Curated annotation (Swiss-Prot):
Gene Ontology annotations for the cellular component aspect, listed alphabetically: plasma membrane
PANTHER family linked: COLANIC BIOSYNTHESIS UDP-GLUCOSE LIPID CARRIER TRANSFERASE, UDP-GLUCOSE:UNDECAPRENYL-PHOSPHATE GLUCOSE-1-PHOSPHATE TRANSFERASE
Catalytic activity: di-trans,octa-cis-undecaprenyl phosphate + UDP-alpha-D-glucose = alpha-D-glucosyl di-trans,octa-cis-undecaprenyl diphosphate + UMP
Pfam families the UniProt entry points to: Bac_transf, CoA_binding_3
High-level lineage: Bacteria, Pseudomonadati, Pseudomonadota, Gammaproteobacteria, Enterobacterales
Protein name from the UniProt record: UDP-glucose:undecaprenyl-phosphate glucose-1-phosphate transferase
Amino acid sequence: MTISQHRFRSNANASIISMLQRFSDILIIFLGIYFSCFINDYFFNLHYVLMALVALVVFQMIGGITDFYRSWRGVEFSVELILILKNWSLSFLLTLGFVTLFSDFDLTFRTFIFWYLAVCAGFVVTRPLIRALAGFFRRIGYNKRRVAFAGSLPAGISLLETFRKQPWLGFEVKGIYEDSFSGTYDLELYAGKISDLINEARKGTIDRIYIAMHMRDEVAIKNMVSQLTDTTCSVLYIPDVFTFNILQSRTEEINGVPVVPLFDSPLNGINMVFKRLEDIIVSSLILILISPILLVIATAVKTTSKGPVIFRQVRYGMDGKPIKVWKFRSMTVMENDDKVIQATKNDIRVTKVGKFLRSTSLDELPQFFNVLFGQMSVVGPRPHAVSHNEQYRSLIQGYMLRHKVKPGITGLAQINGWRGETDTLEKMEKRIEYDLLYIRGWSIWLDLKIIFLTVFKGFINKSAY
């Protein structure tokens, strides 16, 4: 097979996979509404076809914005599935709003929910099947990419090992090329010098080259890239940014200029919309459910000690902006935010009712109003006293990065036991470690998991005084 034939076959198969994805998505959306009408005894007519068309147009538009129909080769299935479910959820909500405002369709809410869930189920079933089909063709030689690595940065070695351990991805690793063996990987992976790599690329025996070299090797990188312009290889650069404790590993393009965020919030674009919807829905439902409890607690606080029912504390919110956080008053003496003394075991300032509220986290229930008003999130790093921020930002590297998202009522640190008094630097460091881990790995599913586990792990804690 000639070089051109190989490249044509690879690209053709990639296009076929993309077409399969689009066709299956169209089919699922239409079959979903048909199934929903059938289950709920509605006659399927042109009106519902038009509704499905609206949903499909919106879904395709959002897919274009989120670049959903790109190649998912090498990306975990969970990432692909989460994005398609996000796209469909937003498309469904927009379609529902459009239908409610501009039409008189008589579909019940139950029918709409059936449609939404049926399409979700369809995506969950078909996406793995398409992946499995693509993996099968790659195993037998179709849609494969012959890849090589220039340099041996740890990030490059990690990517290489992923390709070797997961052959269904369709990457055939030729080896690592560098002018001298660095000794950071198995000798069998060493394929030659950079000049050998360039020669192989010119012969057409390599489809893709990953440059995994230090930024200090700028001259060598430029020289190599210049010579690779005389080939038809795809050349990709693995940024040497993983030496930083980065929050987000993604790339952006601004007016044609590629940028790599080092410290940025994961809540951009559609993620921000979904996070806010999550907060509004969850906080509203919880406030409705706990309204009798709020009334009982407010009465107990008011009748057992002098002072207001609600205690408002100044805390740092998203981007370090001050917010006022609501809590049920649990002390006889108010804290001064300029000089905060943390509550300790047997603290005489804590009332009898307050002791129970603090040990069960019930004193924090009014913060769901903060969530509803947009100052906080249900899930996020817990807000610290202003004086603590000023103290620990100089002691713990990356402390202020926790303010790249809204503070939360519960968080990853809390369900892992890092809640209550932080009387040592080590305890605070551990809490910050979990806060940053949450920001790096944020997803709607992680939020839901934390909310679920909070019910069992996050409320009762002996270290909360």
